[in-house]
Amino acid sequence: MLRDTLKKAEKARDKKALYGEDIDLERFIKEEAGEHEEVPRAREVPKKVQETLLKVGVDPEERERAGTFIQVDQSGICTTCASESIEIMGMNVALDRYSWLKDYMWKAVAVDTDKYTATTALREAEGEMGGYFIRSMPGSREVFPLQACMFIGDENVMQTAHNIIIAEENSELHIITGCATGQDVSSALHVGVSEFYLKKGAKITFTMVHNWAEQVEVRPRTGIMVGDDATYISNYILTSPVKSIQSYPTAYCTGENSRVVFQSILGGQKDSVLDMGSRVILEGRGSSAEMVSRAVSKDASQIYSRGHLAGRVPEVKGHLECHGLVLSDDSMIYAVPELEGSATELEMSHEAAVGKIAEEEVMYLTSRGLTEDEAASMIVRGFLSMDITGLPPELAAETKRMLDMSLKGM
């Protein structure tokens, strides 16, 4: 790692994040996270891990999958690849194989963003490199998705991962990633740094399902660099309880006619604190962005739904939409849409609405034989089941199945 990068990380070791609750990292740092045995196929991971994988859309049988990466705590335990048009491997392997890869590290996400990015870099320098490297070859169009899972199996572990995803020119890549904890884990911290690089004409769809334990803290840090005529589509689903999560991925549309879509489905339960959002910087002529979120708060949960669209050059378009349902007097949704225009001839809009379930809808469903609880549950599931755009038909159907499974507890 470059000396300048390490110096920046050292200075930011205690730097608080701009948003979200501050976390004492010393609570989670264990001298040695348990080592986990590598296996050649996903179906050979421990049964307790397999059961959780299915809940987050990761198939242990690897049916219709182009490849698989599974990390348990800090150990990459399974890597497979069934396609010649893509590469997938642990970051430690990739850095040994490709000397040029270091030039991509900490370019889309600044190492001194906060204590979480800094700690990830410092652990990397000490040899604790987690995360995966994915690359699609120029001109390739992989039909089947890659799947990746970050799994926490030990108590009080701080899991760090640094992922780099590169879509070469005119390539298309689909990724399903699931993050989860074991049934015996009550307290842990996950920090995932992800850097995406989309070259000219490339497309990435990235579908993520989170299924954490109630006392787990989560701090993803994501940056996306989008080149000329490239498209990045993110689908995010979280409907299970978690202690707190704070995520604010930022996409930089530097290329002409580049396009970004963020679609998020959030279900706050128990005393979860969800501080979620996305930011798109439109810097290339003809670039565009769409950010859509659906949020439901129950029990004593708190949801902060943020969105920031910045138009920096003429001829860009963007729309930001946040809709929320508050289902209990002890819960809260705080919508924060921001539009920033610093050029002429741009077109940006936002729509935000927070409310409750309409009584007439409940009355109609109860008149058809449902109880009030059944009626409310049906309305919530319908509200959260928004159409996922931009996916191939087979992957869209699978994503809908993953969403339906996630919504069973709502």
Swiss-Prot record:
Pfam families tied to this protein: SUFBD_core (PF01458)
Top-rank taxon, per record: Archaea
Any one biological process term the GO annotation gives: iron-sulfur cluster assembly
Family stated for the protein in its record: Belongs to the iron-sulfur cluster assembly SufBD family.
Protein name: Iron-sulfur cluster assembly SufBD family protein MTH1150 homolog
